[in-house]
């Protein structure tokens, strides 16, 4: 009888212990939340280049500041954090780990629509300060009067977003930051009829010129469903009026070469055999963006003027220019 009583007592103790351990009324640990980020790779593509990924240079991945917006489930009432150093009001930023630790707890956060914006200037910050709803982000933009390199340059505006339940997991991992700009690279191999011995002034090829046509001025934090055009060209002159076009420079001939600019190759006889141009630009939803190049022909004396004068090469860019895409072209003229 004593044995049965002992077994019953032990069984009751085990049941009581199990019930107390699984009691839903027991408080769950409420910890501060964390958000980790990464810079997304470029999508590299073009007429002669297969689809691939490219992480870009250190300058193209640079982050100088962050702006966090944590909207509630309805896309309203955002908690906002501007981060310009390792410590800020509401948390700390660990750049080596690409992680933000906030003072906000899991219960305070709950489920959130999280947006991370990087490299904001004063105008963009002021606009973000006024954002009240998720949809407002599509109106926040940066305007560049001359929207090509070198005016569009590192550090680049980036953004990324995810929806996350912080009650289930206090860490929101790997929010991808996508550059809000695109990149165009044009490598031109010249045939013999364009291989002249150039006049070089301060490193630039006087006879070779180019212009950007119908580039968009606006860089949006979050792209509108249909982006409206605000276009400009780098020169007003339309072929064959090329007086105000840009002469071909040699910035890409330096070492180390910058990520964008112009460059060229000379052979042993001093003739131009190749041209290269790399520029950043804004996304576009409508076609019409073009790179135009004026190429001088070799004057062999067989044709009267102006037949042996410069010729026009026109590179139409894609009908839609997508952010964070690197369009690379290898052409022979």
From Swiss-Prot:
Gene3D superfamilies: 2.60.40.2580. A lipid is attached at residue 19 (N-palmitoyl cysteine). It is found in: Fimbrium; Cell outer membrane. Residues 1-18 form the signal peptide. Disulfide bonds: none annotated. The record marks 53-54 as: Cleavage. The keyword Membrane applies. One of its GO terms (cellular component) is pilus. Pfam families: MfA4_C, P_gingi_FimA. Disruption phenotype: No effect on autoaggregation. It comes from the Bacteria. A lipid is attached at residue 19 (S-diacylglycerol cysteine). Keywords: Cell outer membrane, Fimbrium, Lipoprotein, Membrane, Palmitate, Signal, Virulence. PROSITE patterns: PROKAR_LIPOPROTEIN. Residues 19-53 form a propeptide. Component of the fimbrium tip. Minor fimbriae are composed of a structural subunit, most often Mfa1, and the accessory subunits Mfa3, Mfa4 and Mfa5. Mfa4 is required for Mfa3 and Mfa5 insertion into the fimbrium. Fimbrium assembly occurs by linear, head-to-tail oligomerization of fimbrial subunits. This is mediated via insertion of a C-terminal beta-strand from one subunit into a groove in the N-terminal domain of the following subunit. The name (minor fimbrium subunit) does not indicate the abundance of the protein, but is derived from the greater length of the major fimbriae. In strain ATCC 33277 and strain ATCC BAA-1703 / FDC 381, major fimbriae are 300 - 1600 nM in length and about 5 nm in diameter. In contrast, minor fimbriae are only about 80 - 120 nm long. This length difference is observed only in a small number of strains, including strain ATCC 33277 and strain ATCC BAA-1703 / FDC 381, and is due to a loss of function mutation in FimB, a protein that restricts fimbrial length in other strains. Belongs to the bacteroidetes fimbrillin superfamily. FimA/Mfa1 family. Tip subunit of the minor fimbriae. These filamentous pili are attached to the cell surface; they mediate biofilm formation, adhesion onto host cells and onto other bacteria that are part of the oral microbiome. They play an important role in invasion of periodontal tissues and are recognized as major virulence factors. This is Minor fimbrium tip subunit MfA4.
């Amino acid at each position: 009888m004593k044995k049965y009583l002992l077994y019953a007592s032990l069984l009751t103790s085990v049941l009581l212990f199990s019930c107390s351990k699984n009691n839903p009324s027991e408080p769950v640990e409420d910890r501060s939340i964390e958000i980790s980020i990464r810079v997304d790779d470029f999508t590299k593509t073009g007429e002669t280049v297969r689809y691939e990924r490219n992480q870009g240079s250190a300058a193209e991945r640079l982050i100088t500041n962050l702006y966090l917006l944590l909207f509630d489930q309805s896309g309203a009432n955002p908690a906002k954090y501007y981060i310009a150093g390792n410590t800020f009001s509401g948390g700390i930023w660990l750049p080596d780990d690409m992680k933000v630790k906030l003072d906000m707890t899991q219960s305070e956060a709950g489920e959130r629509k999280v947006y991370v914006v990087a490299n904001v200037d004063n105008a963009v910050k002021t606009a973000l300060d006024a954002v009240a709803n998720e949809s407002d982000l599509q109106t926040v933009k940066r305007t560049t009067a001359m929207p090509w390199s070198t005016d569009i340059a590192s550090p680049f505006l980036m953004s990324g977003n995810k929806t996350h339940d912080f009650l289930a997991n206090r860490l929101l991992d790997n929010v991808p930051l996508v550059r809000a700009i695109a990149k165009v690279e044009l490598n031109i191999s010249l045939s013999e009829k364009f291989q002249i011995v150039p006049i070089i002034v301060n490193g630039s090829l006087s006879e070779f010129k180019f212009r950007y046509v119908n580039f968009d001025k606006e860089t949006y934090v979050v792209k509108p469903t249909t982006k409206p055009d605000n276009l400009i060209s780098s020169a007003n002159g339309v072929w064959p009026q090329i007086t105000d076009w840009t002469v071909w420079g040699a910035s890409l001939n330096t070492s180390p070469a910058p990520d964008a600019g112009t460059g060229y190759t000379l052979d042993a006889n001093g003739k131009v055999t190749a041209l290269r141009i790399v520029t950043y630009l804004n996304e576009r939803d409508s076609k019409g963006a073009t790179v135009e190049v004026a190429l001088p022909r070799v004057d062999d004396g067989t044709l009267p003027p102006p037949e042996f004068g410069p010729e026009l090469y026109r590179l139409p860019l894609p009908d839609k220019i997508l952010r964070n895409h690197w369009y690379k072209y290898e052409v022979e003229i």
